[in-house]
Each structure stands twice: as structure tokens, then as C-alpha cells.
Amino acid sequence: MKSNFLVWASLGSCFALFVVPLMLLGTVTPSLMKYATESLDDNGRTVGELEALGTIGSIIGTFLPTFVTIPAVGTARTFLIFAAILAVISLGFFISRKKWVARSAVIAVVITALMFMPFNYSFAFWEDDLTVEDESIYNYLQVRETDESVILSTNVAFGVQSIMMKSGGLTGMYYDYALAAPLMAEKCEDVLILGLGTGTFAGQCLKYFPGCSVTGVEIDEKIVALSREYFGLPEEVNAVVGDGRAYLTTSGTYDVIMADAYQDITIPFQMSSVEFFTEVLEHLNPGGVMVVNMSMRSDAEGSMNEYLMDTIASVFPYCATVKVTGGSNLELLATADAEGFARLAERIAALGEDDALSAIMSRVEEGLVPVEGGGLILTDDKAPVELLGMRVLDEMISSELETLRGQIKENGIMSLLE
């Protein structure tokens, strides 16, 4: 039985926030038509002009918040800016009608004043130790520093997008598992990372595979800026701001290509399709390896992971996955080289016991599961990654609810407050 928690929660939230104001705004155009039409001879022109202005307003309202106000001042102040505009317009109307002038003026002044007040609009209001909380065109951004690490999250409640260990060592997360790719490649001279983040994997490649050249593509310019300021992204890393697939199309060839372009719970559809992975294969050198990070793994039939594995296996003849211990990530290694996985095993065996990669690579080798492939193929024309991502979150919510039900049944509802 499908629960669709996210769908219903999103629908309920949208109804609560937007139904009443949108219904009221929906009455504006018909009312204007009524008041502006003075003659049946001119009504067609009048209605057309109003509709044209409405269309222009819709276009401005769509693009101005996304590309200007939200990146510049954030979501909360964007709401206040547009509320103030509506309030000022209403004030002008009531002044012309000589009605409710004082009341409208007070509302307009209050909303306008709120825009300039130094409020701390924190989405993570329960956190008191955030180094940075910001928004960009693409992401909510949260930087938190601990004694051992600096962490970037693009989700207000959970998840780690990037991490820097102050000790300079391994992270204990999926980045360590992904280091199997440069170890597996015939040579590791050129590495491309699609979804650089703050450069965790890039820094590890330079540290554990000295001499390699690393290029990282990150679509979010603010994340690149954070990587330099807070995460110590090495200057040797060529950080490119742009879309990963667009960059890949015009780039050269590489020994290792990592695809790690998750945006919150989903992967961009254009970086999940059979056409994309075909392009990746074409940009790999002989003996090259692709590694894909799959976040929020699921064992359910028809999950996002299953779609991605089937899609990749339809392009790469040799694929295997490994589960990240203690996390929800699944790493997939893919190559067109028949000797690739045998070479990985040989190189892992050759690592000395005191080698920093020895333990984690042994864990990777033990956990590798070959991918057989199937018929669940994502294409540029059809890649429902958002729905697949929501399905995984629904599974997580259902699991948590079952845990809570069991706790309440066993210990009572007051146990939740302890």
C-alpha cells in the first residue's frame, strides 16, 4: 500500500499557505475588467490589455524570486517584499476610493518595516551552532563546525552533502568507498567530478593518488565559494561552475569520472539517463572507471537505485555496487574494461597493512555485488527521479512511524518525551 506521505504533506502545506491568498488574488482580474470597462465598444481592447499585463506580471513573478530576490535576500524576505508590493498597491486603490486608508497604510508600513528589520530567519531554528546558514538559486545551505570536522548540508533536517576532516584523513563516509575507482582505473592521471560539492572527494584523490589532475564541476556558485572559505579546497583542483552534463559534452577524456550530483533527495534527471551514461563512457580513457554515488538506498522493487543500476548496466558491461556501512549510500563502480575488477582486487591485495586505504578498500572488496541489469531504464525523455526519490523518503517515514508505534505500544506515549 502506498503511503505518499510527502505528497499529502506538500499538498496540505500548499493549501494552508496559498489557497486563501490565491483565491483573493484570483478575483483581481475579473474585478478590474468590471471597473475598467466603460463601453461595450472598447471592452475587447480593455480585457486584452489587462490580460497582457497579467501575463507580464506572471512572468516577472516566476523569474524574479528565483533568480533575483531569493539568492539576494532569502525566502522569508522575498515573501515580505511581494506582500509589501501588494499592500502598497492596495493602499493606492483605497486612497483613490477614500476608504480604509488608515488601515491599509498601517498594514503597508508594518510589512515594509519587517523587510528591513534585522531578524534572524533561521530555518534550522533548533540549531544554535551554525557557522553559515544561507540560500542560493539551487540550495538551502548550512555549514556546521565540530571539533573533528566541517560539514555542509543542503537539507535543513538531515544529511551530509560534504565534509572536511580537520585531521586530513578519511571521512568514514561514502567518499572513502569511492576511492576504489582511482585504485581500479588502469591509471589515475585525470579525474572528473560531476557534483564537486565542497571538494571532499577531490581532496582525497590528491592526497591518496598524488600526481593526478582533478577537475570538479559544481552548478552552485555559492557552494564553490564555501569550499574555498571553510573547507580548504586545494588550489590544484580546477573548480568549474556549471552544469555537469553540459561540461562533460565539451570536455576531454578522463581516467576516473565520479557522478555525485544529488540535489537533496533526487538526482538531476539529465544526469540519470542512458544517454548521459553513454556520454560518460565516451569520455573515459581505456581502462577508465565511473563511480556513481547513490544516496538514500532502498531495497524495494522499482526503487531509484534499481532504475539507476539497470540504466548503467545497459551501457557499461562490468558493474558492481557496495553498500556504505553506517549510512544510506550505495556506491556503484562501472567500467568497460574486462580486467577492471580483477585489477582492483590485485591492487587491494598489494596494499600494505599500514596503508591508509587498506582497511576501507578491503571492506569495499568484501562488499562488492555484481550488477546484472534489467529493464528499468531511465531516458532523457522519461526519468521520473523526483517521484522515485519521494518513494524512498516515504519508506523512511513509514519505518520511523512503525518504530514510534512500537515504542508507544511498549512504553506509552510519555516515553517519546523522555
What residues fall within each predicted segment?
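Soluble small-group transferase modules, centered on the S-adenosyl donor enzyme superfamily
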Residues: V101-Y174, A181-M184, T321-E418
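Alpha-helical transmembrane segments of multi-pass membrane proteins
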Residues: M1-E133, E145-D147, A157-V160, E186-L192, ...
